[in-house]
Design a protein with these regions (language model features):
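ATP/NTP phosphate-donor binding region
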Residues: 1-91
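Glycine/threonine-rich beta-strand-loop-alpha-helix active-site module
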Residues: 75-160
């Protein structure tokens, strides 16, 4: 095996969202600006409100990007990354299934490392035999938090 990567923390319990988000604030990580990435359904149905409500209670400044479509394109991720660049978050919260989480991860790479050729990076991950690409160090500008709303994709624990 060339490498193994797992999230630093995994909260797995009904109702743990509030506790997990509260750790982003002064209690543990002292983050102040959250960029929430989700899809139109979760945003318009009000499901994203639970995340933004907790962020509001904490006094954390936040903005939302909800233009993620199923099987998001690189153009979608670039649009989100441009908004990130303007907003300057110190935490990115991906809420949804595989599409919002994958789009948010790409946005995160583009935000942290705008010099990276994403097409080259992605192609190296397509063929398991060629996974020798040195992934850029992440987390200098923002930490990444995934809140899965579906079971099955595993996007919350994979790089792409």
């Amino acid at each position: 095996m060339l490498w193994f990567q797992a999230p630093e923390k995994i909260y797995f319990k009904r109702g743990c969202l509030k506790l997990a988000l509260e750790e982003l604030g002064g209690k543990v990580y002292n983050r102040q600006r959250a960029f929430v990435v989700t899809d139109k359904f979760l945003y318009s149905s009000g499901m994203a409100k639970e995340v933004t409500r907790v962020l509001d209670e904490m006094g954390m400044t936040h903005t939302e990007f909800f233009d993620v479509t199923p099987d998001p394109t690189l153009a979608c991720a670039r649009a989100g990354a441009e908004l990130m660049k303007k907003f300057k978050p110190d935490v990115i919260v991906a809420l949804g299934g595989g599409s919002p989480m994958d789009a948010a991860k790409i946005m995160w790479v583009l935000y942290e490392h705008p010099e990276v050729d994403f097409e080259d990076l992605a192609m190296r991950f397509m063929d398991i035999r060629k996974r020798v690409y040195t992934f850029p160090h992440m987390g200098e500008k923002a930490m990444f938090v995934a809140v899965p709303t579906t079971a099955g994709t595993g996007s919350e624990v994979t790089p792409f």
